[in-house]
Each structure stands twice: as structure tokens, then as C-alpha cells.
């Protein structure tokens, strides 16, 4: 009951309008005003600028430039692992799926079909598979990288709500990650198909991929899809695949099989890009 009461204001707030305003502010070239905003943000969230490729706050023309900053070369060495962690952040949940059911938080599950925008055939490829939900806080590095080598097959934009995706909201909003706006990226690998879902949230101005650029805005009320069978996009493990312009959550789906997550992982634990995420033998 407390969890639902805690998120009640989010049902009442004009989330779309707030997000639109935040996106305009983040993209504005405000000179000294922008620099002061970034300085406040760095101090408020204890952002480690020493590991940024460009640590000089005043050199960023917009807040978005700062928020999507690159890291210094070598700041995130890649583990020798079948699957590496694709982001900096914290583990929300991970584990095995029961059929199409994905565990969100205590008392809450949602379906893989709902997550991928209603495509039952796509979701069926991951029945009884594995999932990982990773939360990116405001202080984190906000580029998303490949957990393994992969070939892009499809990208699906799914319109939705813009609830916050912090742990409190995950406890209080049923089906949160299948309700929010999201971008579903479908890949093929030597270990079978996998899905990377970029989940939007309140104040997340937009999401972008390296092959498409900014996916939203413009925001749509209908599901949109792009296919890449004739012009496949090939990405190596550790390569950037996308980014959040203001932060959110990544959900990954893997098919049924002998996947073993890192035994050091646990819900709520901090994670870093490049660390070992799981063992997953190649297909025979």
C-alpha cells in the first residue's frame, strides 16, 4: 500500500509536458546558465568527471552534451566473458523467466509480449528464457554498449507512459517497463537472438541509437518498426549501441538455454560497463 501511495503523484503529474520541457532545457545552448546547471548537477549527484573524456564542465555547449559524455579510453576495460554488462548502473532484477513472465519487483510481473510491443512471435523466442533489468541513475554514464557481438535485425518504437523508473516506482507501478515508452532492439548472435530494450521515463528527453540517431522525439501514438535484413548493422562486444538523453533503464532478454549469470550479481548491486555479466555457450 505504501509503495502505491508513494507513486500516486506520478499518476497525476503532466509527465509528457514535464518531459518535453526538460528535453528543451537539456538541448538549449544557454552559455553560462548551462554551465551552472551542469555544475549543480555534478555536485548534486556526485558525478565523477575525472573519468570523462572531457572533464571540463564549461566546455559542454548543452546539458545533453554533458549527460551523454564519453569516457576516457580504457576507463571501462572489458572482461573476458560471453556476455558483459552493457551499462553503468545498478541491478534492478535478473534471472530466469517463467514462460513469458518477467519479474519486476515484489508482487509484480509483466509479459515479454507486452514488453516488445505486442509481437507474440518475437516474444515466443524467449519463452522460459532469461532477463536482466538494469537501472541507470542520474549520476551514471548514459551510453549503452553491446553485451556481445550482434547483428541488428529489427528496431521497434513502442509508445507509452513516462513514469519514473527508480526502485520505488518499480515497486508501486504494475507492469512499469511494459507501460513506459521504449525502443526495442532485436539482435542475432552466435548464441541466438537477444533483445535490448531502452525504456523511457519522466524527463528522459529522448533515446538514440548509433545506426538511427534520435528515435524520439517525434513521439508517436502508434508502434513503429524498422527492419535491417537488407542492410544489417554489425556491432562488436563493447561497442556503443545507443544512449539516453537523461537516464532510464535497460531490459535484456535471452532465449532458453544454459545461461549462468555472474554469481556476484544481486538485486540492488552497483554494476559497471564491461564487467562479466553471464556465461552463455554458443549454439551448437
Swiss-Prot record:
Q: What is its main location?
A: membrane
Active site positions: 88 (charge relay system), 145 (charge relay system), 248 (charge relay system), 248 (schiff-base intermediate with substrate)
Cite the annotated pathway: Phospholipid metabolism; phosphatidylethanolamine biosynthesis; phosphatidylethanolamine from CDP-diacylglycerol: step 2/2
Recorded GO MF terms: phosphatidylserine decarboxylase activity
InterPro entries according to UniProt: PS_Dcarbxylase, PSD-B, PSD_type1_pro
Cofactor (UniProt): pyruvate
Which subcellular locations apply to this protein?
A: Cell membrane
According to the UniProt entry, what is the EC number of this protein? 4.1.1.65
Recorded GO cellular component terms are: plasma membrane
Could you describe the post-translational modifications of this protein? Is synthesized initially as an inactive proenzyme. Formation of the active enzyme involves a self-maturation process in which the active site pyruvoyl group is generated from an internal serine residue via an autocatalytic post-translational modification. Two non-identical subunits are generated from the proenzyme in this reaction, and the pyruvate is formed at the N-terminus of the alpha chain, which is derived from the carboxyl end of the proenzyme.
* Keyword hit for Cell membrane: yes
Name the residues annotated as site: Cleavage (non-hydrolytic).
247-248
Biological process according to GO: phosphatidylethanolamine biosynthetic process
Free-text remark on how the cofactor is bound = Binds 1 pyruvoyl group covalently per subunit.
Similarity comment text for this entry: Belongs to the phosphatidylserine decarboxylase family. PSD-B subfamily. Prokaryotic type I sub-subfamily.
User: This protein is called what?
Assistant: Phosphatidylserine decarboxylase proenzyme
Amino acid at each position: 500500500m505504501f509503495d502505491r501511495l508513494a507513486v500516486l503523484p506520478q499518476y497525476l503529474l503532466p509527465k509528457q509536458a514535464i518531459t518535453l520541457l526538460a528535453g528543451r532545457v537539456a538541448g538549449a545552448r544557454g552559455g553560462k546558465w548551462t554551465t551552472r546547471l551542469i555544475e549543480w548537477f555534478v555536485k548534486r549527484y556526485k558525478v565523477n568527471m575525472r573519468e570523462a573524456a572531457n572533464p571540463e564542465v564549461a566546455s559542454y555547449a548543452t546539458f545533453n552534451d554533458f549527460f551523454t559524455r564519453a569516457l576516457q579510453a580504457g576507463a571501462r576495460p572489458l572482461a573476458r566473458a560471453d556476455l558483459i554488462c552493457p551499462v553503468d548502473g545498478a541491478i534492478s532484477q535478473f534471472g530466469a523467466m517463467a514462460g513469458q513472465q518477467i519479474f519486476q519487483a515484489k508482487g509484480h510481473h509483466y509479459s515479454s509480449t507486452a514488453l516488445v510491443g505486442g509481437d507474440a512471435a518475437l516474444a515466443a523466442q524467449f519463452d522460459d528464457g532469461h532477463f536482466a533489468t538494469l537501472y541507470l541513475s542520474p549520476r551514471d554514464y548514459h551510453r549503452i554498449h553491446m553485451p556481445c557481438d550482434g547483428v541488428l535485425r529489427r528496431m521497434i518504437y513502442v509508445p507509452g507512459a513516462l513514469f519514473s523508473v527508480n526502485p520505488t516506482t518499480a515497486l508501486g507501478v504494475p507492469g512499469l517497463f511494459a507501460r513506459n515508452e521504449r525502443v526495442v532492439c532485436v539482435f542475432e548472435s552466435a548464441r541466438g537472438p537477444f533483445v535490448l530494450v531502452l525504456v523511457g521515463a519522466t524527463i528522459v528527453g529522448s533515446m538514440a541509437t548509433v545506426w538511427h540517431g534520435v528515435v524520439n522525439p517525434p513521439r508517436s501514438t502508434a508502434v513503429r518498426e524498422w527492419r535491417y535484413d537488407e542492410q544489417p548493422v554489425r556491432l562488436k562486444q563493447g561497442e556503443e549501441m545507443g544512449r539516453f538523453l537523461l537516464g532510464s533503464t535497460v531490459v535484456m532478454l535471452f532465449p532458453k538455454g544454459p545461461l549462468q549469470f555472474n554469481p556476484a550479481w544481486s538485486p540492488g548491486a552497483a554494476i559497471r560497463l564491461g564487467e562479466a555479466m553471464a556465461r552463455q555457450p554458443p549454439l551448437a
